[in-house]
Amino acid sequence: MTPEHLPTEQYEAQLAEKVVRLQSMMAPFSDLVPEVFRSPVSHYRMRAEFRIWHDGDDLYHIIFDQQTKSRIRVDSFPAASELINQLMTAMIAGVRNNPVLRHKLFQIDYLTTLSNQAVVSLLYHKKLDDEWRQQAEVLRDALRAQNLNVHLIGRATKTKIELDQDYIDERLPVAGREMIYRQVENSFTQPNAAMNIQMLEWALDVTKDSKGDLLELYCGNGNFSLALARNFDRVLATEIAKPSVAAAQYNIAANHIDNVQIIRMAAEEFTQAMNGVREFNRLQGIDLKSYQCETIFVDPPRSGLDSETEKMVQAYPRILYISCNPETLCKNLETLSQTHKVERLALFDQFPYTHHMECGVLLTAK
């Protein structure tokens, strides 16, 4: 695979290899055949980051080859959304001959939605001033004149200039309902929107007969907790990143959901609070003992669950675990399988044409 060529003719083969690999990894814990969810074969990534290379009068996006570290020029990127591809061309055209916008520009980040909105961040090795803002506003207006619904942001050391706003609102059809998700620049969002819809619908399906409340750790902007709220009496969710918590609170209101409570704290701190080890001011007014959480949902970082959180989740009758790294999932399952068994297993082809895969398991207490 090269940045400008996707081997779409190999899509089925690479997906089949992942299915075999996941089954092999899961063999010690389950003999289930994974439910398989396919990605679009192109234009599936909703965000992308590129370094900018200055080559005489020319200017272009580059990425670095992971093996050789050599530069690769990228003028189009079929893995990314069609809107990102349009913006890549338009941004280079708008910046190349503008000394103020071009000088010491070293990176451009793109974030887009299926609802055709975009935030583009320009990163600089220099101070940004009023002249930069004025020129950026001219560029933004020119982009909008091309029917590109875009917001521009300038970033430099200890500086962030928003021309309008630093977020966009995604709208996803999820099991018959439209869900609104505010996505903030420089915060985590699911990279493959089509796959995100399938993950949300799978999570809804595996929890459809749920009783009691749901606890979610690492909730981000509320992606899963808000979609799953319809299957539970109440949802209690934790997240550590301030911008994600603010986005989650907005999303609760935008989706008219009244049974979700978001707490800003790390999973490790929440474990201490649940076990009565420590008290936290942030939990004032929240009666943890009133929650009857029969199900816990975890979507941890690539490193998986730490040992304390492993112990905590084992206390719940049902564990829904979404993993972006099956190796750490399997490491966690060495512990979790002592008390729980795998009831459902899914493979989500979040990252086509790469070694990476995303998977989901539903575990129930033995």
From Swiss-Prot:
- Is S-adenosyl-L-methionine a UniProt keyword of this protein? yes
One GO molecular function term? rRNA binding
Q: Which GO terms describe its biological process?
A: tRNA methylation
Enzyme class (EC, first level): transferase
Name the GO cellular-component terms.
cytosol
Reaction catalysis annotation: uridine(54) in tRNA + S-adenosyl-L-methionine = 5-methyluridine(54) in tRNA + S-adenosyl-L-homocysteine + H(+); uridine(341) in tmRNA + S-adenosyl-L-methionine = 5-methyluridine(341) in tmRNA + S-adenosyl-L-homocysteine + H(+)
Q: Which residues are S-adenosyl-L-methionine-binding?
A: 190, 218, 223, 239, 299
Name the active site residues. Answer: 324 (nucleophile), 358 (proton acceptor)
Q: Please list which residues make up the signal peptide.
A: none
SUPFAM superfamilies, per the entry: S-adenosyl-L-methionine-dependent methyltransferases (SSF53335)
Q: InterPro entries, alphabetically? A: MeTrfase_TrmA_AS, MeTrfase_TrmA_CS, SAM-dependent_MTases_sf, TrmA_MeTrfase, U5_MeTrfase_fam
Give the keywords, sorted: Methyltransferase, S-adenosyl-L-methionine, Transferase, tRNA processing
What EC designation does it have?
Answer: 2.1.1.-, 2.1.1.35
Write out the similarity annotation.
Belongs to the class I-like SAM-binding methyltransferase superfamily. RNA M5U methyltransferase family. TrmA subfamily.
- Describe the function of this protein: Dual-specificity methyltransferase that catalyzes the formation of 5-methyluridine at position 54 (m5U54) in all tRNAs, and that of position 341 (m5U341) in tmRNA (transfer-mRNA).
PANTHER family tied to this protein: TRNA/TMRNA (URACIL-C(5))-METHYLTRANSFERASE (PTHR47790), TRNA_TMRNA (URACIL-C(5))-METHYLTRANSFERASE (PTHR47790:SF2)
Q: What is this protein called?
A: tRNA/tmRNA (uracil-C(5))-methyltransferase
High-level lineage: Bacteria, Pseudomonadati, Pseudomonadota, Gammaproteobacteria, Enterobacterales
